[in-house]
Amino acid sequence: MSTITSAIPDQKKVGMVSLGCPKALVDSERILTRLRADGYAMSADYAGADVVLVNTCGFLDSAKEESLAAIGEAIAENGRVIVTGCMGEEADAIRAAHPQVLAVTGAHQYEAVVGAVHEHAPPSQGPYVDLIPQPSEADIKLTPRHYSYLKISEGCNHSCAFCIIPQLRGKLASRRIDAVLREAEKLVAAGTKELLVISQDTSAYGVDTRHEAKSWKGREVRAHMTDLARELGQLDTGDGTPPWVRLHYVYPYPHVDAVIPLMAEGLLTPYLDIPFQHASPKVLKAMKRPANEAKVLERLKGWRAICPEIAVRSSFVVGFPGETEDDFRYLLEWLEEARLDRVGAFRFEPVEGAAANALPDPVPEEVKEERYARIMELTARISAEKLQRKIGRALPVIIDEVGEPDEDGDIGATGRSQADAPEIDGAVYLRNVPATLAAGDIVQVTVEDADEHDLFGAIARV
């Protein structure tokens, strides 16, 4: 639940439960920013809220179950609940499970959800529109101050067989490049040290607008991933250094190659999140994904030649309909050669409305589980081998949390290297840090040990 309080008498308070991906989190921030402009405060718990918003996820059946459970908990604890987000597109299913909900709105229907809050918990004060920026430039953050998600577009033009994002979020709709850069500049000025660029398809940014250029700092800048990355890398965090800039959800188009030199130059964090999903040409074709796994291996080698520090994260689906043991072994062999830095895997789940549901030869659940265990075992071993090579090196680390002194007075801290995005990747655990260290500080750390996913070390002596 968000915590933003106010001393204004009788001010109505809103609670927020945000589920799902970082893109949904950005939507939650935007909704809360608008509500604060309209005179609301935010409640840190159910008891203090006049109404509770539940921003749902509807991508997988398991996510829908989690969303319905969260709605039920909010109803039990508070009783006045408004539902929004991706599962909001299934209003009948929500009302069948929880008829007490006050209102249901769909994904990124900002005006509708704000209107529902006004209807069921009218603000006791007038709007404070002069106190904060426009809603498109999120003022309320649900992440720590030192990192922020920067959403550059909504929707997707692909028709992957396992996905219903286009039905939930629509076709690609890119934000104006100048609006994105203004938001990024504002976030950095407010203390953000790390920008995480997100969308449904970051590589396609600007395709729908034919990469329309806008004026920025006296020059024309195109709405294109490469141009955006270059501009973000020129922002100043206040000490003469740029923020860390990570690219997430990058579809492997050929023009992705152009951002690798920016990483080598230090303008962009050497990190790419590319959801390859599989390696077997047969499975990729069934998924309606690009099937050129050999070319991907060549590109990985080329990227590493240009920027040896690059970390590549990806996600894969196991147990897709028609996936044979040979297909799965092909994937494992491909992963052995690709040696990706960070890997997430998911067991295939049928999603209502997805084309994959009609495919023949479903994989039994016990086979999915066995394959999931095998892919996680392999990728954990590869990760451990790669992290072992970092022992003895000094790496830049951004601090996420500083602990309390132990009985000996030693203070520990947790941070992340440039190879680690928040919440989904590994961590760096530091020992005996100075009491002056704070979240958001970027320090050089000497790596002393490593396991399958995390590093351990101490601040390097200058």
Curated annotation (Swiss-Prot):
Cofactor: binding details: Binds 2 [4Fe-4S] clusters. One cluster is coordinated with 3 cysteines and an exchangeable S-adenosyl-L-methionine.
Top-tier EC class: transferase
Catalyzed reactions: L-aspartate(89)-[ribosomal protein uS12]-hydrogen + (sulfur carrier)-SH + AH2 + 2 S-adenosyl-L-methionine = 3-methylsulfanyl-L-aspartate(89)-[ribosomal protein uS12]-hydrogen + (sulfur carrier)-H + 5'-deoxyadenosine + L-methionine + A + S-adenosyl-L-homocysteine + 2 H(+)
Organism: Erythrobacter litoralis (strain HTCC2594)
Gene this protein is translated from: rimO
Domain Radical SAM core: 142-385
CDD domains: Radical_SAM
Function: Catalyzes the methylthiolation of an aspartic acid residue of ribosomal protein uS12.
Keyword Iron: yes
Residues that coordinate or bind [4Fe-4S] cluster 1: 21, 57, 86
A Pfam family that the UniProt record links to this protein: UPF0004
Positions of the MTTase N-terminal domain: 12-122
GO cellular component labels: cytosol
Cofactor(s) the protein needs: [4Fe-4S] cluster
Protein's name in the database: Ribosomal protein uS12 methylthiotransferase RimO
Alphabetized NCBIfam families for the sequence: 30S ribosomal protein S12 methylthiotransferase RimO, MiaB/RimO family radical SAM methylthiotransferase
Family membership: Belongs to the methylthiotransferase family. RimO subfamily.
GO molecular function: 4 iron, 4 sulfur cluster binding; aspartic acid methylthiotransferase activity; metal ion binding; protein methylthiotransferase activity
Domain TRAM: residue ranges: 388-461
Annotated positions binding [4Fe-4S] cluster 2: 156, 160, 163
SUPFAM superfamilies per record: Radical SAM enzymes
Keywords of the record: 4Fe-4S, Cytoplasm, Iron, Iron-sulfur, Metal-binding, S-adenosyl-L-methionine, Transferase
